[in-house]
Design a protein with these regions (language model features):
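Thiamine diphosphate
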Residues: 3-8, 32-64, 69-185
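Acidic-glycine-rich active-site phosphate/pyrophosphate-binding loop
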Residues: 17-36, 62
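A short, well-structured juxtamembrane/interface segment
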Residues: 1-12, 25
Length: 191
């Protein structure tokens, strides 16, 4: 399965959740599959989807146990193996902050798909073992879970999902919004 099909599969479960998507082709593919105001399409900042997702999750997490629309939304981050390897410090920060509304999904194709499919070191590293070593309690291989059930359950911790995919980019169109339009539409919807 390639990333396009993986994103399509996951987006069938997404209703009101906020989605932050990695740069380049992943964002283009998400845009083609299911464009909506609650999708934040990253443009030009490789490695930072997990950090942006963490910031949103911390802002929306329930701090005092109350649940309302403004602070209990789940944040789903679509990231890539190359981006996670560029910013591995974000994994330690996510673990230590542990927002209980963050789901980080790493599409691992073993390459930098948006820059020409150069190999990443993820081919030699077990990312699930890395996050377990950091201390994540809820980390899964996508093939071993029912994502719909994961999404429905009340989280006790941040969740890490490793999604092994084949290299390849869909022939998805360029996003026809400027960065300012993406930001403004997103913020208007989530605030």
């Amino acid at each position: 399965m390639e990333r396009f099909d993986g994103i399509k599969d996951i987006m069938e479960y997404i209703t009101d959740e906020i989605v932050v998507c990695n740069i380049g082709f992943p964002s283009r593919e998400l845009y083609q599959i299911k464009d909506r105001a609650k999708n934040f399409y990253m443009l030009g900042s490789m490695g930072l989807a997990s950090s942006i997702g963490l910031g949103l999750a911390m802002a929306k997490d329930t701090v005092d146990g109350t649940k309302d629309k403004n602070n209990s939304e789940k944040i789903i981050v679509f990231d890539g193996d190359g981006s996670v390897l560029m910013n591995m410090g974000s994994l330690a920060t996510i673990f230590n902050q542990n927002p209980k509304n963050l789901i980080l999904i790493v599409f691992d194709n073993g390459c930098y798909g948006s820059t020409g499919n150069q190999c990443t070191y993820a081919q030699n590293i077990d990312l699930l073992e890395v996050v377990k070593g950091i201390g994540f309690k809820d980390c899964y291989d996508y093939e071993d879970i029912d994502f719909g059930e994961i999404l429905k359950k009340e989280q006790k911790n941040s969740i890490f999902i490793h999604y092994k995919i084949l290299p390849g980019n869909a022939d998805s169109p360029i996003i026809d919004m400027s960065p300012d339009e993406i930001r403004d539409r997103f913020l208007e919807d989530i605030i």
